[in-house]
Amino acid sequence: MTELNKYIDHTNLSPSATSKDIDKLIQEAIKYDFKSVCIAPSYVKYAKEALKNSDVLVCTVIGFPLGYNATSVKVYETKIAVEHGADEIDMVINVGRFKDGQYEYVLNEIKAIKEACNGKTLKVIVETALLTKAELIKITELVMQSGADFIKTSTGFSYRGASFEDIQTMKETCGDKLLIKASGGIKNLADAQEMIRLGANVWVCLNQFQLWKNYLN
């Protein structure tokens, strides 16, 4: 199994995050060789420069956290993020349109953003807390069709994060055709390891750095 550090997108998407906070995040990611840092779009260029001599990737978010921006806005955000050096894009679907049955709209939006990624990794945030099991299966199928690389459970701004059931349902639906990012819902190392066992390829939670230090000890 891959070392646990390579499952971690070290994240600070707080609206009050300062450059000092981002510096701290970056230095922790370098020290522990995490997979990536996940930060607001305005910090992408800054982080890319700070990480240029490391293997840590730069991830940012699009249409975040509510996902109801126009597709054209999300595409523009994506293009700018890629120009600024983003290696990975985490986009939020339009959950309302999806729940309304506008599947073609949702699929075409993901495809448009994937094209704007210009070869960079695309993760699709579906906000599992707001979906029924049947809806989760359907959106997983749409993400598979879109050409995206990952399906991601949550923004961290809804009432709950990932559950074991979410990960199991997504994995049973997509098999090896998509990678899975579990966001939130992880309270301890046992939870993180269970998410990985069920099929998660990346995980993130509010206290992930403390969990990582516990893992080292």
Swiss-Prot record:
State the organism's lineage. Bacteria, Bacillati, Mycoplasmatota, Mycoplasmoidales, Metamycoplasmataceae
Tell me where in or outside the cell this protein is found: Cytoplasm
Q: What enzyme category does the UniProt record give?
A: lyase
The catalytic site is made up of D90, K152, K181
Organism of derivation: Metamycoplasma hominis
Family, according to the entry, reads as follows: Belongs to the DeoC/FbaB aldolase family. DeoC type 1 subfamily.
**SMART domains tied to this protein:** DeoC
A Pfam family it matches: DeoC
UniProt-listed Enzyme Commission number(s): 4.1.2.4
Q: State the GO CC annotations.
A: cytoplasm
Any idea which UniProt keywords this protein has? Answer: Cytoplasm, Lyase, Schiff base
Protein's name according to its UniProt entry: Deoxyribose-phosphate aldolase
Function of the protein: Catalyzes a reversible aldol reaction between acetaldehyde and D-glyceraldehyde 3-phosphate to generate 2-deoxy-D-ribose 5-phosphate.
Q: Name one GO molecular function term.
A: deoxyribose-phosphate aldolase activity
Gene name of this polypeptide: deoC
HAMAP family in the record, alphabetically? DeoC_type1
**Gene Ontology process terms (BP):** 2-deoxyribose 1-phosphate catabolic process; carbohydrate catabolic process; deoxyribonucleotide catabolic process
State whether keyword Glycoprotein applies. Answer: no
